[in-house]
Amino acid sequence: MNIVYHSSNSFVPVLGVSIVSILQNNRETEIINVYIIENRWTEDNKRLMEALVGKYSNANLYFIPMPNMNEDYRLGLKQIKSIWLFDSYSRLFLGSILSENVDRVLYLDCDTLCNGSLREFYDTDFEDNYAAGVIDCLSDPYYELFDMDKNSRYCNSGMLLFNLKKWRDDNMEKTVADYVRSKNGYVFFMEQSVVNILLQNKIKIVHPRYNTYTLMVAFSHDNLRRLRHCTRYYTDSEIDEAVNNPVIIHLTNGFYVKGRPWIEGNRHPFRNLFMKYRALTPWKDEPLFPDKSNWKQKAVTAFVKILPQSVMCSIVGWVYNVWRPNHIRKSMK
């Protein structure tokens, strides 16, 4: 089993929690190869991660220096926001970053937790698809914004099982690079939109239990529909199954949930599970990350809690699904 992450040095304590949750829940797997595409890690953090993974006899750890995604692949990426890192594009170049003998790999964002065996999912039959993933909750205006056809499904790129053999055989890295250059280095939602646009109808859709993200837990079915106007999505029963028995949990950010589990004062629904696995890492005694929310973000969080959730979702839903796509379209011209 091959697992790959990318991480900066500052996020190592969070990544450690994700890795230990996988190793704890997959002891029956013969071999787990953990690849970390690292961006300027300290030697101390590398040693601590080696010590963590070294406790599991079925696990191997490999560090790979993060390429300069812009220069090495000549993508011409534009820095629209200072917080955006081009490192996230590395998941679309795993065919060349990882060795040729890796023909299947599970890519995970660092903000994920494993809550069960990955074996069944990892062995998914690709059926000539490039990847397997979980649908993100987006409305039709976003599909139109990205010129995606009516049969396509937009997946969250924080968890993707890649068919690297097909990826390499079809020279998808060139396709990705050519597309990004054709957009002058700017694609909204970055690599997530790139992979969805280029792999339309070639991502195998799997059960949401393999990427149970915060939205699924924070809102009722009706309020989620009010908030996101999503029509190309899972059934209510599938979402219930994912929330009640998730295998991969994605600790995504959200305006309605205060903080994420590694932030001081957070109220995330999976904070206790996160802390359970954090206690098994070398970073267990380090303080949680400080809350860096500015006053506007704190005001929004407080305001939306005052309104009935259904009313709040209707208001925010109009902004997110009507005003925002039009604003994005103008910015892309």
Walk through the language-model features, giving the residues of each.
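A glycosyltransferase accessory/donor-loop signature
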Residues: 7, 169-333
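Active-site beta-to-alpha loop of glycosyltransferases that engages the nucleotide-sugar donor
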Residues: 7-13
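Short, acidic, metal-binding catalytic loop of nucleotide-sugar glycosyltransferases
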Residues: 21-30
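Short internal beta-strands
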Residues: 32-40, 133-134
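Short, charged/polar "capping" segments at the starts of alpha-helices
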Residues: 40-47, 141
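GT-A fold catalytic core of metal-dependent nucleotide-sugar glycosyltransferases
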Residues: 67-69, 87-139, 152-154, 161-162
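Conserved nucleotide-sugar donor-binding
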Residues: 159-171
